[in-house]
Amino acid sequence: MKKFTTFILTLIIGVCQAQNRDPEAQTLLNEMSAKVNEYKNMVLEFKYTLDNSEENIHQETRGNITLVGDNYVLNILGITRIFDGKKLITISPEDEEVTISKQNTTEENTITPSQLLTFYEEGYNYKMDIIQNVRGRKIQYIKLNPIDSNSEISYVLLGIDTNTKHVHNLIEIGSNGTKTTLTITAFKTNQPLSESLFTFDASKYGDYYINNLD
């Protein structure tokens, strides 16, 4: 789940730095990051797919995420994850369990949205790739290749709407042939949000097991 959350946040916030910089790609990435930073909040819906033809695997699911600064509420696979800036609350209705833990920003695959602005600072080379027309929208792809030759990732394609400067999708191709795609299906900004959105109310989960790891 940590890796999945990282993947989603990477798509939303995007990639802005790398070692081998294509100036044209760098300009587009900077514009995308600047646009994201303009918003007070973002409320997004997305589709997540995982495919591996050799293993005959196809998985598809949908979810949504609300972001305010580093705080977020993520709903995916029936699980809700709430990060309030200090603690990470994971709510699993299927298990009737709530897990509360501190967000350890030094732990691998545990990052916050603001940190994603430099997440790939030393990990990738990148360049402009193809342009696609998606229902009248011009989507420019940037191809990122990992510097580490032993990486489990073969390459990443980041699709950016050239008009809105919003991320359209992120496609990750694994070294084992697995293709993971995250596509934004709805993108709303500066929405009226409840002040208690990131507050966990234990009284609503009286029958749940509360696992406090602090």
Residue ranges and their predicted role:
Residues 16-56, 70, 204, 209-214:
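N-terminal leader/targeting segments and the immediate start of mature chains
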Residues 62-111, 180-181:
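An acidic-aromatic
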Residues 103-137:
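Flexible, surface-exposed loop/linker segments and immediately adjacent secondary-structure boundaries
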Residues 1-21, 25:
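Bacterial Sec-dependent N-terminal signal peptides
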Residues 48, 92-93, 171-174:
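Beta-turn initiation residues at beta-strand->coil junctions
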Residues 124-206, 210-213:
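Gly/Pro-enriched, hydrophobic low-complexity segments
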Residues 35, 63-66, 80-81, 127-133:
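Short, exposed beta-strand/loop patches in secreted or surface proteins that constitute
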